[in-house]
Regions:
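Classical Sec-dependent N-terminal signal peptides that target proteins to the secretory pathway
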Residues: 1-22
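Secreted/extracellular ectodomain signature
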Residues: 21-137
Length: 137
């Protein structure tokens, strides 16, 4: 009986141990003005590390996922992307930021230090930072 129990826990661990949420997106994304404003609203408010900011692949739609509890479990990207896709007529969505850290890599010069954004940053500075990394023209 104990062997079967260990086997079931092992299978459950494999199913829920999806690391796709840890892989940054790497493609050319251009954000619309509305998406930039929504991103600014997202980073200007109180954020937890578990919060996610998602964008559609065309950069026109956004979705904010906020952890409703104090402690949230890590989930795969599909968990976060489903409600975003539903909101935007089945357009594919990807995670753009986790907490205040941009995880979508648009350019080779993005380093881990340069993608953190402070809560007190102005909209103009956000636009400059997004332009620097190729998210806006």
């Amino acid at each position: 009986m104990f062997k079967y129990l260990k086997f079931y826990f092992f299978i459950i661990f494999l199913i829920f141990n999806n690391h796709s949420h840890a892989v940054p997106e790497a493609s050319d994304l251009k954000l619309s003005n509305n998406s930039i404003n929504e991103f600014f609203n997202y980073i200007s408010s109180q954020r937890k590390n578990a919060d996610r900011f998602l964008v559609t692949l065309d950069g026109t739609g956004t979705f904010t996922w906020s952890c409703p509890q104090t402690l949230c479990f890590p989930a795969g990207e599909l968990f976060y992307a489903k409600p975003c896709s539903k909101k935007h007529e089945k357009k594919k969505c990807k995670i753009f930021a986790k907490g205040r850290k941009i995880v979508w890599s648009n350019s080779a010069n993005m380093s881990q230090n340069s993608i953190n954004i402070k809560q007190s940053i102005s909209l103009t500075d956000v636009k400059k930072k997004l332009k620097k990394f190729g998210f806006i023209d």
